[in-house]
């Protein structure tokens, strides 16, 4: 990581240009996330842009071909996320190029990320080490079966006054405070 990351890169037959994540069209960013099967809504992506920093790769006609973000948690810790490459251009160096920009921004910080199976080789090549396995489950919430006879603890909507307790619970589980989120 001694040499600075370049501002453009030839990928396949496309010349890519780096830009800030804030400059990216939200609908193009959403389309990029959908192209890899991520269940993010446009409003989720906007929230991530407001909380984090990062980069996108654009081709000469302005199409987004990749993204990478980082999220500061205090002065010495950050998480990395939203590392996406267009399926057509995966394995051509776009993600690594964007990660070089992110890692340059994060110098001196402890970093954490969740890697998909497809991205593990990239992160390993950047000297990240596996720590634990995380399983992500997705589904549709359905009403509870009224015929269930098992006692269930009461469930209620989280309110504003619950935020401090939730942030403390999250900090204990995650290992660092994310109260700003």
Feature locations, PLM:
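Conserved N-terminal entry element of GNAT/NAT acetyltransferase domains
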Residues: 1-23, 140-160
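Conserved acetyl-CoA-binding loop-helix of GNAT-fold acetyltransferases
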Residues: 85, 91-104, 121-125
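Helix-loop element at the rim of GNAT/NAT acetyltransferase active sites that forms part
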Residues: 23-24, 31-43, 169-179
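Conserved beta-strand in the GNAT
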Residues: 56, 62-71, 78-84
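Short loop/turn motifs at secondary-structure junctions and domain boundaries
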Residues: 45-51
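Ligand-binding pocket scaffold of soluble enzyme catalytic domains
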Residues: 18-21, 26, 31, 56, ...
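Conserved GNAT acetyl-CoA-binding A-motif
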Residues: 78, 105-117
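Amide-forming acyltransferase catalytic core, primarily the GNAT-like/NAT-type
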Residues: 128-181
């Amino acid at each position: 990581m001694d040499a600075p990351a370049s501002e453009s890169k030839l990928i396949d037959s496309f010349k890519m240009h780096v830009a800030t994540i804030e400059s990216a069209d939200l609908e193009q960013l959403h389309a990029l996330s959908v192209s890899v099967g991520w269940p993010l809504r446009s409003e989720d992506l906007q929230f991530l842009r407001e909380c984090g920093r990062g980069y996108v790769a654009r081709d000469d006609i302005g199409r987004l071909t990749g993204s990478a973000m980082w999220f500061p948690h205090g002065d010495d810790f950050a998480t990395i996320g939203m590392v996406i490459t267009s399926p057509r251009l995966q394995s051509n160096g776009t993600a690594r190029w964007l990660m070089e920009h992110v890692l340059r921004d994060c110098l001196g910080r402890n970093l954490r990320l969740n890697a998909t199976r497809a991205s593990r080789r990239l992160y390993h090549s950047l000297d990240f080490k596996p720590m634990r396995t995380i399983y992500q489950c997705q589904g549709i919430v359905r009403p509870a079966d009224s015929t269930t006879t098992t006692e269930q603890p009461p469930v209620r909507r989280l309110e504003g006054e619950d935020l401090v307790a939730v942030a403390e619970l999250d900090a204990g589980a995650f290992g660092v405070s994310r109260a700003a989120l």
